[in-house]
Amino acid sequence: MNAEEDPKPADSDSSEECIICLSNLPNCPLDQWDSSSVPASISSTLDGLRIAKIPCGHYFHNHCLESWCRVANTCPLCRTEFLKVDVLEFVKGPWYRAYPVEEKTQSVANAGEPFEDEGSETCRCVICGRSDHAEVLLLCDGCDDAYHTYCLNMDAVPIEEFYCPNCVLLNYQENETLSSRISLSRRGQTRRRRVGAAARASRVSQQQQRAWTRAWNAIRNRAWDALNSDLSYYGMQQERLPARDVSSELLRRRIESARLRSNQLNEPVEQPRVVQTPVTNASEQQAWNDFDEILHANSSVHSVATEATISNPRPSSGRFQQTPIEEHHQQDTRFVNDPNSTSHDRRQKRPTRRHIPCSNKSSGSSTVLGNNSSSKSENSFLASLISNINQPSTSRIDTSFMLSLQHEIKNSHSEASDGTSDVHLTPLFSNLSPRPSHVPLSPREISNDNLDDHLIELSEPGEIVDNHLVNDTSMHQRRTSGRHDLVHSSKKVSYETKYRIERLVNAALKPYYREAKISKDQFALFNKNICRSVYTALSDGTLSLEGPQQHKISKTIREKVVNCIQSLSND
């Protein structure tokens, strides 16, 4: 009962955080909560420490949200508009009061102030595009275009009126047209009126041409200032950057906290996967039952073959082995001479096949030998095949199956080649090399250590080896040996960073290109090399766009551009 009446204060680490002041929110009654981590401006009053809840479900300090509502009525986290605020005692605590919020309209701070474009007042030479050397910068009296005296090959500033080449050309064409029309209008009085109208029309067209020229000059000056504003912007940032470290760090923390909270709220709930049981009809069910019966029969055959192999082990290769014909005669003699043998034993004796009469004795012996060896190989091959079916299909089982298959093929042909005549042998099996001393017939006898040894033994001249088996084994060894060498941790440069670096390099190279110090191909080559070197420095951590090290990038780029120009001049 005491535990229910006096709840213990929760751990401050598990409490929520106010996104506005970045301090913990009380998750228990205020008299039991430690307010030392809250700023003094908030903890001075109980109403400021209370929790303000908005309709979107986010919690803030009431004091912080009141200050926020003076500017905007949107949630600081999800930007949802709200017109009402509920005040609680603590997070998920009892309701205390509520108050309305007025709808706020955001406005631009300097909307009433006129915008002054300083770049439009700058006069630049139409030919070279520069505004320096103002003492020799001439303004045309007709179209207000600016020209340097050295750009027009003039020795000094003219005292009388100055007209640009464009205006001179227009005036010449106008005078020529007027003179031709005046000469033609001398024939009559009516023609003179037409010449006056044509002259007025030409003057109007000339004025319109000059107006368009002024407009294009203003646009050109604005574009020039916009393209060359990056370097000056970084120079201004270099002076103001140390004073903004604290505020930028606080803003970064707020943005990161808001992002984490939004990810937690928008995290999708994983639904359990529904496993559908396949529906089978009567014919499919009967087929599966037949398949199970066949597998059961194969397992019984495998057990019988295993017992026979254990009771009658194969003699070693070092001992003397009898031929199948001698074994057959010995069994017949034993059953005939043994007085204790019964009729039941004679009925259980394995019947022998009658030999086909042949003129050659060796051919008959080889035929009997082939029959016996084929029966033995069929039994052992069937046993190994059933064991491979019962066991799971892995690379090790496939390897043992290929080894056993190779052994059985080689064993049958090697026994068949022991006869006196080689008439029935093909050239492929006549070149077979002697079989190894021991080849494992079961997948359990083959391990990862001696797998390569067996592959080497079986891959002798004249044998059939599965090339896919050898390739898979070598590929697996190379894959496991070089697995740790493929780990490569490299910091990639983002697309926005590359775009900013490329703009800085372009701005640094443009003056040299306009002065015809470098060609178009050299401009592209220097731009690519400098950008790649800066990308490498950013990846290595030598340069950085964060903190007070931003101004180093523009300085480094200017130095690299100067070095490239100097190397070009030296060459």
Curated annotation (Swiss-Prot):
It is found in: Cytoplasm; Nucleus. PROSITE patterns: ZF_PHD_1, ZF_PHD_2, ZF_RING_2. One of its GO terms (molecular function) is ubiquitin protein ligase activity. InterPro entries: PHRF1/Atg35, Zinc_finger_PHD-type_CS, Znf_FYVE_PHD, Znf_PHD, Znf_PHD-finger, Znf_RING, Znf_RING/FYVE/PHD. One of its GO terms (cellular component) is protein-containing complex. Keywords: Cytoplasm, Metal-binding, Nucleus, Repeat, Zinc, Zinc-finger. Residues 305-377 are annotated as: Disordered. It comes from the Eukaryota. It holds the Pfam family PHD. SUPFAM superfamilies: FYVE/PHD zinc finger, RING/U-box. Residues 305-324, 359-377 have a biased composition (Polar residues). A zinc finger (PHD-type) spans 122-170. A zinc finger (RING-type) spans 18-79, 125-168. Residues 346-356 have a biased composition (Basic residues). Its main location: cytoplasm. This is PHD and RING finger domain-containing protein C126.07c.
